[in-house]
Amino acid sequence: MNRPANRFFLKPISLAVVAGLLAPVTPAFAQSDEDEVIEEVVATGTRLKGTATAVMEERKNQAFVADIMGAEQISRTGDSDAASALRRVTGLTLVDGKFIYVRGLGERYSSTQLNGSIVPSPDPTRNVIPLDLFPSDIIESLSVQKSYSPSMPASFGGGNVDIRLKSIPSEMIFNLSANLGYNTENSGDVLDYQGGGRDWFGEDDGTRAAPVAIQDRWESKQFLDNLDPEEALDLFSQVKRDYGPLEESADPDMGLNMTVGNSFDYNDDWRFGFLATAGYDSETRASEQYELQDPDRIGDDITLVRYFDDIRGTERTVKWSSLLTLGIDYNRQHQIDYSIIALNDTRDEIREKFGNTENLSLSEGVRIRDIDVEYEERTLYTNQIKGMHTFPELNFMGFDWRWSEGRSIRNAPGNMEARFVIADDNEDGFYDPATEGSLLDAQTAARYSFQTLHDRLENYGYNFTLPYTMGKWETEFKFGADFVSKARTAENRRFDVNTLGFENREFLEGSIFGDIFSDENLAGAELNNRPVLRDTTIAGDDYVAAQKVDAYYFEADFFFDNKWRFTGGVRWEDFRQVVAPLDPRTNQFDLNDEADRSQLAFQEDDFYPALAITYFLKDDMQLRASIGQTVVRPDLREVSSSTYIDPLTDFPIAGTPGLETTDIINYDLRWEWYREAGNNLSVGLFYKDMDAPIESVQSPAQDGPPLIRIANAETGEVYGVEVEFLQGLEVFGDGIWDNLFTSGNITVSDSEIVLDRQNIVDQTGVSAAITNTERRMTGHSEYVVNFQVGYDSDNGEHSASVVYNVFGERILIPGIDGFDDSFEQPFHSLDVVYKYYPDFNTTVTFKVQNILDEQKELTFEDTLLRSETKGTSFSLTYKYDF
């Protein structure tokens, strides 16, 4: 509801800041006699703390605890997407560059909305959407609500992230920008392979796809079982085999963006407008990595059994985005907007890995060499229409509604992995893959996999608001409904190359997969009675899932005597979900018995209340307290017994039928002080009490990476303190201090879960030799620090920011069999962003990221488990506003 006019008035300097941000500067106006005065206003507020003032006004008017980040703040930090930008928000950490952990709680404990609507996810293993899909260029602001309100989805743990896209401008805008970039890890030649003709656009042209003959067999449910040796060889000859690796120079990073929009007054009552944006970015990142898969303990010493100690990788990403918004406004009281959004993020990675296994090791005089190629396209299409209506004749009653339909696709048309063996034939201690290597002589010398996922989601809802004033009480009643329908289908096919099917295997010597299996070699190959292709698609590789939520809520907002604000209400949700693993060969449910079937279908309905109280200590100071009851439900695949590979960690994950929901009671207390010119300070406390928290546990694995199981702990809690500030440094004196400001936030927190070994065994049906039955939650960091120093020149031509971010160590893999938990180590991110404004139309941006050249590390008991270099990135952007 609208706050009383005398609640938090804008100081004169704040008004100047906002005016400088919003007022257009036409060429004629820029040449007027007041030119110097205008430039002085811009220098005073626009880039120093301008948008901070705007977003602070919104934040302090929220009934519940929330943090908001505006477009200019994102621009100052130089972050390229929503995921990177959100790590600057108090208490938020970024995991795998895609998922946000709010207050130390995993991605399943947060929810994401796009313009207030739920959107589908292209991730086959998670319900939540990867936030790196959303480029910064289309974002107007990011809102993170940390305390639950009944108007939000009840599936709320750490918080709710609402990505607000740019809307129709108040006047004509048209700008173009281009950027070039470079990373220090890309020096020299990098790994590469021959892809398709449309890789530049992030789209496979069919090069990687399974040949039509194999696809026809899969469609007809024949698969590749019991093939004749000649038929298997013929099918294999049609498969792409030219995967290198090659040595090529890396292309520079590049990007292009365009925005155009305008609004038109038809008459005094009607206004029309539009906004269109399009962007394209390509990036190449080479890296050096280390990967320990299987350690062993002998006494007090840890020995390495299966590991890759020399890994080179190259990852290419192509992102493109487009947004079109159309709007109509009548008399400033009725507004309807329609938006269509298309986003694409393609990742193409090749890795060359040298290492040892238990049977193939240096002690045996051999090394192994793996070639991995992973290619995936993630695409999101969304249509949204929303309306906002105010009825002055009905005591200014408000009504808003929205409808959204989204479709997300993950397409991995053809990934490949192959294993070579290198023998030290020359006995010189040097393992040369070109002269001493050969393809592994085994049933699985190479593996091809093909994956698709389609996620469709429809979300619609409405809200009514009715303000009412009586004496010293100002009241607003709000009620509404929210409906979500979601359907997902996923398919996975794979086959192995069986080199035991060749009678004469001398031609397997070499280091290039495509040369070994050249057309000439295959044509002259001698076969035995074993087919060279083995279909390794298994039951559970396919699954279908559906989800439906019907929700209604009521909320009331009371102001009393300009001193107190009471906001509370209740939400009722009816949640239904079903997940069914399928046998690809029969297209029938892959269920062992009726008990399994009943556990895969889940339904619950309940009430979720919340209450918030705000006390206004002064005109610019307030104290908030809130309590809310919420729930966190298992992800779609986590209630299926089938095993799948997490594409982000490469760990196998097994779901658990009968997994229970997590009930959470959330407590928040926050003191806020909003001062002139955007300066502010806030201190908050939070506590979350969880019953049956959903957690990751590790089970013993026979070979390869550890097997991760999803299970319920007994109890859990998270608590901590958050401090946030923004302060101009003019308090230290005149001169340069007038041009500087600092901002930042610190979160210090702790968490604890209690696990019961026997209960986990009963729930998962496997051994659970858990090392620590009481530990922190997976992914929780005990501290998160963000700090920024900003500079703006007196003439408004120069702007610079130094930005620092670090998170405390966090558990990634819980330990078993006496091994301690594995921790991802702190990553000290230090970036510099400099902007030059030679005139009112031009912006030149120079950005340096990861100045400290930090690398990602995962350790346990002072033993390195994984590492990956990141390099230092440089980029130069030119933007022109017409």
Task: List each model region and its residues.
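Conserved C-terminal beta-signal and adjacent last beta-strands/turns
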Residues: 6-9, 31, 444-453, 462-469, ...
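N-terminal periplasmic "start-of-domain" segments of outer-membrane beta-barrel proteins
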Residues: 42-73, 107-113, 117, 122
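Short acidic/polar hinge/loop motifs at secondary-structure boundaries
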Residues: 88-90, 117-146, 166, 192-193
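A beta-strand signature from Gram-negative outer-membrane beta-barrel systems
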Residues: 133-177, 243, 733
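Transmembrane beta-barrel wall of Gram-negative outer-membrane proteins
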Residues: 219-351, 379-383, 609-612
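Structural signature of Gram-negative outer-membrane beta-barrels, strongest in the C-terminal barrel
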Residues: 329-331, 339-341, 377-386, 404-406, ...
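Outer membrane beta-barrel strand-and-loop segments of large Gram-negative receptors
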Residues: 441, 453, 461-463, 508, ...
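Gram-negative outer-membrane beta-barrel transporters
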Residues: 680, 685-689, 705-810
